[in-house]
C-alpha cells in the first residue's frame, strides 16, 4: 500500500530542499522509511502475505543502498538523517 498524497507532500516538505524536491536522497530515504513502517503494521495482521513481504524487502534494500550512497558522499547529512528518522539505536 502506498502513502497518501498528503503524507507524501508532508514528508517532501519536511526533508526536501523545497516543496518539489522529490529526488534528493534524504527525501527518498524518508519516503521509503514511511512506507516500510506502514507495511510493518500490515504484516502484524497478515502474517502469510509473502508477496507483499517481497516488496518490503525490496524497499529495505533500496533504502540501504541510498543510505550507503549518502554515507559515502556526505557523512554529516547521513548522520543527521539517521537521527531524524530514528533508524539506528
Curated annotation (Swiss-Prot):
PROSITE patterns: RIBOSOMAL_S15. It comes from the Bacteria. GO terms for cellular component: cytosolic small ribosomal subunit. One of its GO terms (molecular function) is structural constituent of ribosome. It holds the Pfam family Ribosomal_S15. PANTHER family: RIBOSOMAL PROTEIN S15, BACTERIAL AND ORGANELLAR (PTHR23321), SMALL RIBOSOMAL SUBUNIT PROTEIN US15M (PTHR23321:SF26). One of the primary rRNA binding proteins, it binds directly to 16S rRNA where it helps nucleate assembly of the platform of the 30S subunit by binding and bridging several RNA helices of the 16S rRNA. Forms an intersubunit bridge (bridge B4) with the 23S rRNA of the 50S subunit in the ribosome. This is Small ribosomal subunit protein uS15.
Amino acid at each position: 500500500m502506498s502513502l497518501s498524497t498528503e503524507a507524501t507532500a508532508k514528508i517532501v516538505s519536511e526533508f526536501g530542499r523545497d516543496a518539489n524536491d522529490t529526488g534528493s536522497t534524504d527525501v527518498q530515504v524518508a519516503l521509503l522509511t514511511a512506507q516500510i513502517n506502514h507495511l510493518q503494521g500490515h504484516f502484524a495482521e497478515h502474517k502469510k502475505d509473502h508477496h507483499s513481504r517481497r516488496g518490503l524487502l525490496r524497499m529495505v534494500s533500496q533504502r540501504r543502498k541510498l543510505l550507503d550512497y549518502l554515507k559515502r558522499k556526505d557523512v554529516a547529512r547521513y548522520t543527521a538523517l539517521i537521527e531524524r528518522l530514528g533508524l539506528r539505536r
